[in-house]
Amino acid sequence: MISVNDFRTGLTIAVDNGLWQVLDFQHVKPGKGAAFVRSKLRNLRTGSVQEKTFRAGEKVEKAHIENRRMQYLYASGEAHVFMDNGTYEQIELGEKQIERELKFLKENMEVSIMTYQGEVLGVELPNTVELQVTETEPGIKGDTASNVTKPATLETGLVVQVPIFINEGETLIINTGEGKYVSRA
């Protein structure tokens, strides 16, 4: 059990028969009445985001999520195969389970698979990934107004806004949390 006063971003808790990850929280002390903690939680099974308010000092169960380092091998129909680097055990995850993460996954990429009591919850990506540009319009000389961007399609099918000097074939660093261009690799 953990007090809601000890909430941290990224903490996983078990509340209302669900597994939740704390995305954001705020301690509130109104002029009248008792203090409370307003939180924004993401359901690890469904991916839905919900706002929930707890009384200050309320206790909730901390969920112990195990992260296993795995390598993304390949896609087989709607199943995606991952291999444990230590035991060489392979698991399959459905497309619906990792829909958002698919935009950043390439073969042989190292990821963390989140599990809770043997149940696979999803894939945790690194903060940034390197992806190659497969399609983009050429930059126009003289079009140098500040922060001019253009769309670029990456090798995974993800479309991001990039500066005009980026060309096809270049490798870019992409932030997986926001899905945005960071820099050239």
From Swiss-Prot:
Gene behind this protein: efp
Similarity comment: family membership: Belongs to the elongation factor P family.
Classification via SMART domains: EFP, Elong-fact-P_C
Protein name: Elongation factor P
Organism taxonomic ancestry: Bacteria, Bacillati, Bacillota, Bacilli, Bacillales
Keywords: Cytoplasm, Elongation factor, Protein biosynthesis
Record's signal peptide: none
Function as written in the Swiss-Prot or TrEMBL entry: Involved in peptide bond synthesis. Stimulates efficient translation and peptide-bond synthesis on native or reconstituted 70S ribosomes in vitro. Probably functions indirectly by altering the affinity of the ribosome for aminoacyl-tRNA, thus increasing their reactivity as acceptors for peptidyl transferase.
UniProt-listed InterPro entries: Elong-fact-P_C (IPR015365), NA-bd_OB-fold (IPR012340), Rib_uL2_dom2 (IPR014722), Transl_elong_fac_P/YeiP (IPR020599), Transl_elong_KOW-like (IPR013185), Transl_elong_P/YeiP_cen (IPR001059), Transl_elong_P/YeiP_CS (IPR013852), Transl_elongation_fac_P (IPR011768)
MF term (GO), any: translation elongation factor activity
One of the GO biological process terms: peptide biosynthetic process
